[in-house]
Amino acid sequence: MALVEDVFSLSPKAVSSALASLWRPIQGGVSAPLGFQAAGITAGLKDSGKPDLALLLAPEGAVCAGMFTTSLVRAACVDLCVDHLQACGGKARAVLINSGQANACTGERGWLDSLRASQALAGRLELPVEQVLICSTGVIGVPIPMDTLLAGLDPLVEALSDEGGAEAAGAILTTDLVEKQFALEAELGGRSVRIGGMAKGSGMIHPDMATMLGYLSCDVGVEVDAWQAMLKRVVDCSFNAMTVDGDTSTNDSCLAFAAGELLEQEHLQALEAGLLVAAQQLAKAIARDGEGATCLLEVQVEGVVGDVEARRIARTVCGSSLVKTAVHGRDPNWGRIVAAAGCAGVPFDPAAVALWLGPHQLMEFGEPLPFDRLAASRYMQERVDGSYLCDDTVQIRLVVGDGSGDGMAWGCDLSDQYVRINADYTT
């Protein structure tokens, strides 16, 4: 489903609110920008019979930027993406995504299978093989059933459409409960500009890329180096600022395509603002869809020396199992929050700490304040009962000094359902 709720909850220092407000949500996803096509089909890669093969095709002249897992154990498709982007100078045009098999820890066969898939698709699209990227998601150690995948390429290409974003978003899911897609539009330099996106992720989610796949598209031209730098800044404040369970994956990838008339230099900051809005919304959707989650957790940290340090504290709080279980139990246990913040490796004065849980202030000058525990617990329960990605967010605000740095991170609560899902994942 398209996520068109209020999304402009950006860090004040990430982008100005004036630039973010230029963008308005529209229906659609990754194929919403002009010239982009997408498709998603059921090829038979999953035993469940659910959609499992997706394709995104960018117009001629597109540039592509990529961010990938930081894990030393990387899937073959990640290595292939890196190699192909280098070989084509960032001029990739297509990405094929299979779900069901991660094709990680599969040795030389895994690499050859990814290469074979890219070669087969390149032939059908009449593209140089270096312009075709491959992404996989699913169970680690399981190779792709190549005969099944290759048999699915012809119907997949035939299904390409500028209205195929929703089908593509559905075909990349694994344990996700909902599709994650989003689109925006703005007037920049007297012309309409659109940004689209889709993502998947539910478990094995942690900062520095997580078991997530993210795809962004835009119908203006941007120089390759500027586009790559822009994507890195955006990912640092979105996909790298979320956590579900603290585990980093072998397959994490975020690819961004831009194609169209070159955008004037003076509008690049506004474009980045829109890209950040889209990426943050997708990141929040991933965190909210965390396995077994009942609510979204948003932590804002202020008062440290810089934004990077603020995000580090926020991520640490979001990732704390004790904080996450307290939120799930609707327990306003503020001690767990400040204890987690103190473990982030960022210096601050504990005597300067102030803390809020939603509208309830819990601490001031490093000491607890009297507060209505039942009301604070009720605040969290009301978020659980709220509507999806609208008023279902438990908000924590932590001020640790008078520095200029601020940052946000997103996570979710931790339930017994998460344990059941992952205990039974391969059985």
Curated annotation (Swiss-Prot):
It catalyses: N(2)-acetyl-L-ornithine + L-glutamate = N-acetyl-L-glutamate + L-ornithine; L-glutamate + acetyl-CoA = N-acetyl-L-glutamate + CoA + H(+). It is an enzyme of class 2 (transferase). Its main location: cytoplasm. The record marks A210, T211 as: Cleavage. Keywords: Acyltransferase, Amino-acid biosynthesis, Arginine biosynthesis, Autocatalytic cleavage, Cytoplasm, Multifunctional enzyme, Transferase. The keyword Cytoplasm applies. Its EC number is 2.3.1.35, 2.3.1.1. The active site is at T211 (nucleophile). Pathway: Amino-acid biosynthesis; L-arginine biosynthesis; L-ornithine and N-acetyl-L-glutamate from L-glutamate and N(2)-acetyl-L-ornithine (cyclic): step 1/1; Amino-acid biosynthesis; L-arginine biosynthesis; N(2)-acetyl-L-ornithine from L-glutamate: step 1/4. One of its GO terms (cellular component) is cytoplasm. The record marks T137, G138 as: Involved in the stabilization of negative charge on the oxyanion by the formation of the oxyanion hole. Pfam families: ArgJ. It is found in: Cytoplasm. Substrate binds at T174, K200, T211, E291, N422, T427. One of its GO terms (molecular function) is L-glutamate N-acetyltransferase activity. The keyword Transit peptide does not apply. GO terms for biological process: L-arginine biosynthetic process; ornithine biosynthetic process. Catalyzes two activities which are involved in the cyclic version of arginine biosynthesis: the synthesis of N-acetylglutamate from glutamate and acetyl-CoA as the acetyl donor, and of ornithine by transacetylation between N(2)-acetylornithine and glutamate. Heterotetramer of two alpha and two beta chains. Belongs to the ArgJ family. This is Arginine biosynthesis bifunctional protein ArgJ. It comes from Prochlorococcus marinus (strain MIT 9313).
